[in-house]
Amino acid sequence: MNNFQNIPDNELFDPSENMLAASVDERVYHRVYLSAEYAVNLVENGTPQFLARAEDVVRAVLKCQELDKKNPHYGNFFWEKEEGIVEDLNAVEFVLIRFIPMTLRYSDRISKSLQKKIRSAVRIALDEVARVDVGLIYTNIVAQDIVNSILGGQLLAESSYIKRGFKKLRDWQAFIDRNGIPHEYNSPVYNSVTINALSHLVELTNDNEVRMIAKLIMIRLGISFGLHLHPKTKRLAGPHCRAYYPFLTLQTSPESDVLDDHINHKQLPNWLRKLVLHRPLKMNVRETSDVQKKISIGTYHSQSFSLGVASRELDTQSNRYISNQSNVFSVQYTRGSDLTPGIVYSRYLLNDKWLGDYRTTLSRGDRDIFFEEGSFRGIQDGPRSINIYAPKNLGAWERCFSAKASLIWHSDINEIWINGKDIKELPIEVINTDVIVVGCGDVYVAILPLSLTNLGSEAPIRIVKREQNVVLELYNYQGPTKTFWELARPGAFYQGRTRCGFYAEVAEKSDYSSGADFAAVVTRGLLIENFDDPITYNGENERLWAVEYRRDNETLGIELDMMQFEIKRMWTHDASDMLPMLDSPIATQALDGDVKINDSILKCEGEGTRWLVSLPDEHTWIAAFHGPGPSSFILEIPEGRVEIDKLTRGLITWENGQIQIEATGLEGIPKIVGGLITKIN
């Protein structure tokens, strides 16, 4: 008996169209790329009945390719069959990333006639991929572009596609290596999309250099993934460049399961589990995704919580499908051993909009994206952060009756303290000199509102309940519907962006006797704001706003030019580089020089990114050099030494004295002290 129910998403199969279908607002849509995924799963199963259905599904998907040669997107695909047009330009990548590897792996399971159709479709699709030529900032799509081009070229025996893909791969690696991590930082969804795409290339490419570059990018992404996983919540700590609402509010499977799947499928190495489980109980991680735009992400792990803050939102694409999805501030926390973790996160909202008021298109639900309407600048260090918002599109075009930053507790809270007083009733209004402490799960979250620009007669700060959430609202405006000439850019009245924001600090409940006790500690600190007097913008002048919090011997600060809403500087008491490629107690990365951590050192004389993971308690060290030029390579650890005369790109793993060396351009015999080589290439 052939049980189609064992195939993922089989319950969505519509035999009348041979595609997967979903109902949205009582209208049925047939999903093109998900149907392609369904076909792959059928082919992998391999029984005659499954293969027969797979052929029907593939043919149905191919009918959703744009075949009008006059169309500028000839060769692309519809996102849904019902659209009948190409709008989402990513559709071609999402279909090809399924059909190309499937055909390379399982050509013996696919009829000759269908293979011919697939190859014909792939050829015109790859021409469309080249015309679209996605930019290097779009991480998951550029990864699919590269994989589809190289493997599609192999499938078609067409070197021009391979050459284009290889060039783009090298350009992408160089782009990443100027910063630290890929531009789409720390996404609970698109991390895996990128890893899955690159894993096809690692497995199926005929070129060792291609394989090595793809593997280095994939593993570096895996390191970032692992460093942001919290061992107790089992979730991917913030900040997130893009997080759909079910992922943001922890309604999906834990990301620890996702990492395990990648490891179990041999896409990522097993030692990443050690990186998650065997590390300091309290740990700060900082990475940079864009040095030029000063985008860094900071995450602090404590026993019961993680705090994640981005220096700015992902704002490099003006696209309703992609933009305004960043999760720039969040605290994830445990709520006892058996409960789903809780979360508090932030949004800037206009006209009292909420979840359900925005959808990308009719065929996608209105509960996927909690639309972010603010621009954000922030800095984090340990359990503390300064978080600054400005409305993104408030000006003299659209009318508005409310504009506010909101801190949203998605899970039940236990207690609220204001200036040490336990609050029992909501709503309640506060002022910006109040100290607010919220007890939720196993943590306390303290908030100090910053000074706010009042665009009307009143700009209240209040704590309210909204749809089972508790929300701290920080208003810039509440009043009659109007435009704001003073915010129009360009404009004759513009004097800079509005001020709005908060200082946040998180603590373990077990460290304090009450919320009042924690509030007293936070109050001991000094919150300092300095801002320039109003001045009309002349195209060159600046108007600075600096915010700093000091307590004991610790300092955290950020300064912005409010005319451009750009970061001038960020600082802490002990960090000289606020835009490191990677800085943590167990992993670090640099563009040049020696890399040192935990009594271990990596020395590479050549130019190029190098990184080191050090887990001495697990007798595990991993080091890499990204190239692209040749370099010597010396890894010195407490248990021994690896010395390589020359390599172009390399990954060296030392686990319990067993050494694996994967490299291109390897010259000379590696010299080993204290260990044994078990694998070379």
Indicate residue ranges for each PLM-predicted region:
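A broadly conserved detector of short glycine/acidic/proline-rich loop/turn motifs that flank catalytic sites
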Residues: 72, 306, 311-313, 392, ...
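Non-catalytic interaction/regulatory modules that flank or connect domains
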Residues: 286-362, 366-367
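Aromatic-lined, polymer-binding surfaces characteristic
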Residues: 26-205
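Carbohydrate-active enzyme catalytic cores, enriched for enzymes
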Residues: 205-314
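Extended repeat-based interaction scaffolds and adjacent low-complexity, acidic/S/T/P-biased segments
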Residues: 356-681
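Boundary/entry segment of secreted carbohydrate-active catalytic domains
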Residues: 1-30
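Long, contiguous N-terminal structural blocks used for assembly/anchoring
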Residues: 3, 27, 44, 69-73, ...
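Composition- and surface-driven signal marking solvent-exposed, interaction-prone regions
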Residues: 210-216, 311-312, 320-325, 398-406
